[in-house]
């Protein structure tokens, strides 16, 4: 992310250059950013991706034509992580599975600062609806869950990955098929318990 820095400087003999530095967390050392020509009074700083702090300062040191210098340091400001995690891939061990069987999912995900948590969702209608199957810490890179009932030709798994700043990244698996593995159910409705039927008479059976 770009951060705009601006300043005012003048000198009786003329200016030569401006040198920009930053420091974090009250460090004694300022880190060099860049140097610019004397006619400039602003700069767009590309903040390093891994830099996150509640106390950052900018220092500008200005040189004149006879090599005398002076500097000024900004007030403290914060740098927040605004970069979302990236899910490179969601890996399934199969392209076909039955209901009630266990599906193993693995993934590769990265973040500029660090990952915090992962949520795993399942859909059997090509992503129109999702069911949360599990939440876990980012130290894990695999998870298994039991496929719920429901035959499908367009099932998929979605991951939502969060970093420590609350930024989210998303990854979706390839579509896979879910086959029928649910036995039929039957319930006899009649005759009911305690019914007496005479020998040679008809007995009506019904069921659902």
Residue ranges and their predicted role:
Residues 49-54, 149-153:
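Surface-exposed, short loops/turns at beta-strand junctions within beta-sandwich domains
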Residues 11-21, 111-120:
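Solvent-exposed loop/turn segments flanking beta-strands in beta-repeat/beta-sandwich domains
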Residues 60-62, 159-161:
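Conserved structural position at the C-terminal beta-strand
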Residues 41-45, 141-145:
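Short strand-edge motifs at loop-to-beta-strand transitions and within beta-strands
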Residues 6-13, 64, 81, 108-113, ...:
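Extracellular acidic, Ser/Thr/Pro-rich low-complexity tracts
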Residues 1, 94-101, 194-201:
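Short, solvent-exposed loop/linker segments at the N-terminal edge
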Residues 83-91, 182-190:
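Proline-enriched interdomain boundary motifs that mark the N-terminal boundary
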Residues 23, 123-124, 191:
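Conserved Ser/Thr-centered positions that define the repeating blades of beta-propeller domains
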């Amino acid at each position: 992310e770009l951060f705009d820095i601006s300043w005012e400087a003048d000198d009786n003999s003329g200016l030569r250059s401006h040198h920009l530095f930053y420091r974090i967390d009250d460090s004694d050392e300022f880190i060099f950013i860049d140097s610019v020509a004397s006619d400039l009074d602003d700069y767009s700083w590309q903040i390093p991706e891994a830099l996150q702090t509640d106390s950052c300062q900018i220092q500008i040191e200005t040189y004149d034509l006879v090599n005398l210098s002076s500097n000024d340091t900004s007030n403290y400001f914060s740098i927040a992580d605004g970069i979302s995690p990236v899910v490179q891939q969601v890996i399934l061990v199969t392209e076909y599975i039955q209901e009630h069987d266990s599906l193993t999912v693995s993934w590769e995900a990265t973040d500029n600062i660090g990952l915090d948590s992962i949520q795993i969702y399942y859909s059997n209608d090509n992503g129109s609806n999702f069911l949360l199957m599990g939440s876990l810490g980012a130290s894990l890179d695999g998870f298994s869950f039991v496929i719920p009932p429901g035959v499908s030709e367009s099932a998929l798994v979605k991951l939502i990955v969060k970093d420590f700043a609350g930024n989210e990244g998303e990854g979706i698996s390839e579509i896979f098929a879910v086959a029928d593995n649910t036995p039929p159910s039957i319930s006899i409705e009649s005759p009911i318990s305690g019914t007496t039927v005479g020998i040679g008479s008809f007995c009506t059976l019904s069921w659902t």
